[in-house]
């Protein structure tokens, strides 16, 4: 199997990223597909890596969806679900505030996720500008998963986002992340989610106002598991079998 990772930049800023795990004979076709993903860019980096010992995860997190009339209501609900997942309310509220203001210490977005101590709210990622990226995950049969989600009523324009985000959230749980908070930095996309082993993958709209280019991810973890979780998130390859 091969891991194929695409990263696109425009004027020095990250604008698009995607990843696939495919058999060797599908590498060329997949690279061409990933090159079509960024809408605008001045630099694209494609990495192809041979993988060993790919773990099969039987099922993804179950999907639930909720719509609210305001960002305030949506975020309050997100906090309640994070509390249900085991995150203390002050820590959940701190994470919301962090993503709202921009998690990069220099202002704006990070390339990866914040790692937050679930008990204290302390930031644990070694590089607070870069963060931690969850990589080397995909679906065993991506085409089949797309068809199933279409039949469930997921709109075509949201499919790729949902499939990619659900794979990330599922791998995070596999690696020991206790809960996750996320919303996109895409100004036009206001749906975010919270996720965890006990709450599933919970889509929530709107987690921010339209036109806001700030977003990111917060992973809630136990501090004593930091090194093990980082290694798993960044290095352990997994394929998800089914929904």
UniProtKB/Swiss-Prot annotation:
Catalytic activity, reaction form: heptanedioate + ATP + CoA = 6-carboxyhexanoyl-CoA + AMP + diphosphate
Pfam family, one: BioW
One GO BP: biotin biosynthetic process
Domain of life (superkingdom): Bacteria
Keywords: ATP-binding, Biotin biosynthesis, Ligase, Magnesium, Nucleotide-binding
GO molecular function: 6-carboxyhexanoate-CoA ligase activity; ATP binding; magnesium ion binding
UniProt cofactor(s): Mg(2+)
Pathway recorded for this protein: Metabolic intermediate metabolism; pimeloyl-CoA biosynthesis; pimeloyl-CoA from pimelate: step 1/1
Enzyme superclass (EC): ligase
EC numbers, comma separated: 6.2.1.14
Alphabetized HAMAP family for the sequence: BioW (MF_00668)
Subunit structure: Homodimer.
Family: Belongs to the BioW family.
Described purpose of this protein according to its UniProt entry: Catalyzes the transformation of pimelate into pimeloyl-CoA with concomitant hydrolysis of ATP to AMP.
This protein's name: 6-carboxyhexanoate--CoA ligase
Gene (name only): bioW
